[in-house]
């Protein structure tokens, strides 16, 4: 099942509100990886093991099954794995940030312009279209209405180190208790 993507929102809000770097700076390593990297054995073999399930989904099939019709359709260990569409999406976010900065917006405002493009602009259009094309339920309204909630983290000390984790909606309390 698919849910409204929250990771991009979380990253951009945290960067805008608490960070000092640009969106371009933090996305650069991901862009390099999307340009292509030698895939590790565990990932390549997992793709191969799950290829029948992957084949049910047009876009996943196009990304992960690099040798359609061959006995092994997944990439081999060490083969360069490329995610062109991911790279292009990340570049669009950077383009939006740069454009906003050129128009006089500050760093925070420029990051929120990229956020807006992802959740309300052409990227949102493509997410909604491709999801619905495959029977999914995510709409552009879902994307536009997505909100990030900033919460006070849980905290404990472990060997004189402060450890912070998310609140009770994940398994953080268990981890923090196990440290003590």
Regions found by a protein language model. Name each.
Residues 1-180:
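Feature marks proteins synthesized as precursors that undergo proteolytic processing into two chains
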